[in-house]
Amino acid sequence: MIRVATSADDAFILGLVERFSEFPLPPGRDRQSVTAALRRDLELHLHERPITSHFFVIVQDGERAGFMHLQLVDDFFDAGLLCHISDLAVSPAHEGHGLGQRLLVHSEAFAREHGCVRLTLGVFPGNERARRLYARYGFEPDMLRLGKPL
């Protein structure tokens, strides 16, 4: 079951932040900084709950198993509304049961319901498992962000 997250889910959501750096990170990025930045961003959105942010929790066997954070924003290039998958994580205990896939299907349905013209996400190059999942669901490079540590 996928449901809208409530403030009672905040600690669970924040408890999955470490998942976003459990793979090789690009040069110049370290786990501590990445985790801290993502935690700050999630805390901000969870605290303020802006109208453009939507959090969902997936439940399996009565237990919270993962979450997804969607943001509705204007597409810079074609002025249409897009839905950005800002965060998507499944707990280690629930990996391999198709929950990430179910969250992706839910994100697409949500985006269509809200009249979005595009569904986007960002992923670190080293997160190969997620990249394979996203490719299976039709995600392909839209705009590459390149970086150079200074």
Predicted regions and their residues:
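Conserved acetyl-CoA-binding loop-helix of GNAT-fold acetyltransferases
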Residues: 87-90, 96-109, 132, 136
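Conserved GNAT-fold acetyl-CoA-binding loop/helix
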Residues: 21-44
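A short beta-loop-alpha structural element at the N-terminal edge
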Residues: 1-15, 26
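Conserved GNAT acetyl-CoA-binding A-motif
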Residues: 104, 111-122
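Conserved beta-strand-loop-alpha-helix junction that forms the acyl-donor binding cleft
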Residues: 95, 117-130, 147-150
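A short helix-loop-beta-strand connector motif used in the catalytic cores of GNAT acetyltransferases and
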Residues: 43-57, 84
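Conserved active-site alpha-helix within GNAT-family acetyltransferase domains
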Residues: 101, 113, 125-143
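Conserved beta-strand in the GNAT
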Residues: 57, 63-72, 84, 89
